[in-house]
Amino acid sequence: MSIKVLNNNDKEVNVLHFQGKNVDILWRTFALVKNYCELNPIEDYLSLVSCWTDNNNCYLYQQLKNNNIELINALPYNYDYTQKWNMINKIKFYIDCLENRVNTKYVMLLDGYDVLFTSTKDILKKFKKTGYRIIFNTSYNNYPEEDIDYIENREEKLGFFHYFNAGCCIGYREDLIRFYKECLDFVYIYNPLQSEQKILRHCFAKYSNDKKQKFIWLDYKREIFHTMALTTCSYDANTRILKINNNYEGDKIKRQNKKKI
């Protein structure tokens, strides 16, 4: 019997992002989700896309393969696996992959090494309900720690998870192509960590404080995506429900440490 994963509002969530070292910190939760979340077939006209170089370490690929669900690798067939990884190329790979998926209307772009599905139920229903063309994951972590995308009254408006996270998104295929092409306009930005997160955030900033735009926004209610940084989890073996809670104590410690600096 499959387990069910709920956010702190008791709503079923679809995708967990164990960003950074959270695969190691929340390894029990990770193992529960990877081994005991049974997934139904993906809805028609929705494609799942990622980039990965090692099938053995791509947990998302392994999970979806075990559930007979296709995960498309955006890396080209002639990709040189010996070359140094370049996040700018990752953006270009996504664009090329999406342009070739002409029969796909919706696409979900996902990190391969620290993302798992908990459910495939009602993904498109939740997405369409937002009214936006693209929805990105959110995180408590402001990474990189710069004022890039301004949102008025960010924390009051969006809650605990209020920063853009590039690890997961869903959108209409043609709009994702448009957005990722716009991201290439920001590749000149100084980016010592070679992170596409910084580039994508600069592009997101073009839209983030425009209250009238309905092009791109954040899944701050965590109805589709849920970042696992600063969370705690509790599992009830009787109901087979895994509950995710915001770690406000961790939040307080983080704020106190910032004040000391």
List where the protein language model places each region:
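Catalytic core and acceptor-binding pocket of nucleotide-sugar-dependent glycosyltransferases
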Residues: 1-27, 161-261
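N-terminal anchoring/stem segment of glycosyltransferases
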Residues: 19-106, 129, 174
